[in-house]
Amino acid sequence: MSIKEQTLMTPYLQFDRNQWAALRDSVPMTLSEDEIARLKGINEDLSLEEVAEIYLPLSRLLNFYISSNLRRQAVLEQFLGTNGQRIPYIISIAGSVAVGKSTTARVLQALLSRWPEHRRVELITTDGFLHPNQVLKERGLMKKKGFPESYDMHRLVKFVSDLKSGVPNVTAPVYSHLIYDVIPDGDKTVVQPDILILEGLNVLQSGMDYPHDPHHVFVSDFVDFSIYVDAPEDLLQTWYINRFLKFREGAFTDPDSYFHNYAKLTKEEAIKTAMTLWKEINWLNLKQNILPTRERASLILTKSANHVVEEVRLRK
């Protein structure tokens, strides 16, 4: 069955791995094995083959979209007789905890910045826009981190709105996973990038996801291209537990770590703790607030074992 026949009743074109890999065309590999190793997450296998077959075709597609967007901006400037401000192209990356959003974001940042146009690519995570722990404690939301009510959505929307309005210097708060909190006075300044990659659980959410805090403009209103990284729930749980175990032997051993006490757990205790955290917080957030946004994405990457992408769906 052809791609066209497969997708008559869906807004997406569906590609298996081989079909998608063929769309790389002649795009050269610009990352070395060592660079790829530095880009991968703590619990992920990221091979040269994965970058070549999945991310190079995606970077080629994005380059087409970005070039088209720049031409459209030039037409508007010609019509208005103005010299337009630099308006960044915004790419959002959503998906569950432990699915590998951050790795996808870092790989795309590296690839897009190495196209011949030498575009400047900034990467921001929405973790920085979580309310500080003090606020979450006051509101009884410490066990709801990552849920819609835990974010300062007004600040996040203002951040992307300012960027799209051409504001030259825009600041974003920075989150530390070591202290499990927003870093006080740790803002990062973003200076007119050509491309902004915005990575987070909530970047595809809209008004229906924020009944507790009604407002009329959302992050998704400013996004030019959105990606959802998907995987079966059993794999997500396994990846989350494995990541927790690696943190137990690594980051959690730091005395400054918010979760330092977890480093003292036995492996069996750590697995039990991770499963509880997954079921009571992360799985619940996935089912209620993250997975329902998947079909809003421009492109869906579906992973199988070992974080290997086996299917790509591209909105028509």
Swiss-Prot record:
GO molecular function, one term: pantothenate kinase activity
Primary location: cytoplasm
Pathway annotation from the record: Cofactor biosynthesis; coenzyme A biosynthesis; CoA from (R)-pantothenate: step 1/5
Cellular component annotations (GO), alphabetically ordered: cytoplasm
Localisation per UniProt entry: Cytoplasm
SUPFAM superfamilies in the record: P-loop containing nucleoside triphosphate hydrolases
Reactions the enzyme catalyzes: (R)-pantothenate + ATP = (R)-4'-phosphopantothenate + ADP + H(+)
EC number: 2.7.1.33
Alphabetic keyword roster: ATP-binding, Coenzyme A biosynthesis, Cytoplasm, Kinase, Nucleotide-binding, Transferase
GO BP field: coenzyme A biosynthetic process
Domain of life, per lineage: Bacteria
Binding-site list for ATP: G95, S96, V97, A98, V99, G100, K101, S102
Family under the similarity heading: Belongs to the prokaryotic pantothenate kinase family.
Protein name: Pantothenate kinase
Primary gene name: coaA
